[in-house]
Amino acid sequence: MEREIMARLAKWKDSPDRKPLLITGVRQCGKTYVIKEFGNRYFEDVAYFYFEGNKGLASIFDYDLEPERIIKELGSIVRGKEITPGKTLVIFDEIQACPKAITSLKYFYENLRELHIVCAGSLLGVSVKRDNVSFPVGKVNRMQMYPMTFPEFLCANGEQELYKGAGRFEPGKELPELYYVPLRKYLKYYYLKLRT
C-alpha cells in the first residue's frame, strides 16, 4: 500500500539537515505501518520499540539521556542486536508514553546525528502539556499524517488506472460513465471505511 507521505520520508532520510523525525496523527491512520514499510525499503535494518505499556523500555531513559548509552542498551539488551547508525532505522512508537524519550530527541540530534530515528505518537500535544514534558523545540523535524486519502484508497485497491484516467478530465466537468460508476462505488466504500 503506497502512501503519499513515503516520498517525504525518503527526502527526510537524505537531507543533510536531518533531525530526529516526529510523526503525529490520529490513532489508526497508518503511522506504524508506513514507518515500518519505510524502514524495510530504505534501510538494511529496522529497530522497532513500542513504548505504550512497556515500563522496562521506558526505564532505559531514567538513568541519563546519553544517546550512545541508550542505543547500546536498546540494541544489546532489549533487541539482542546492535544498532548501526546510517544502516539501522530506529523507530520509537507511541513515544508519548515515555516523556523522557521525547526529551532525549534533543540529545540524539546534538550528539548522534548520523542515526536515523523516527518517532510516532498519537495525542502527543495533550501528553506533552499533561506530563509537563521538556519538548525538544528546534531539535526535531515534524510531519503530520492523516487518514488515507481517496486517491491513496483507489491505488490501495488496485485502481491506479481508474485514478489516472479520471484525473485527465477537467474538474467540475461531468465524468464519462466509464469512470463515474466505479468511482462512485469506491467513494461509498471509502466513506464506509472512514467511519469504521
Which positions does each model-derived feature cover?
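Sensor-1/coupling segment of RecA-like P-loop NTPase cores
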Residues: 110-132
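Interdomain motor-coupling "hinge/lid" segment immediately C-terminal to the ATP-binding subdomain
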Residues: 128-196
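Short glycine-rich substrate-engagement loop in P-loop NTPases that contacts/grips substrate
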Residues: 53-86
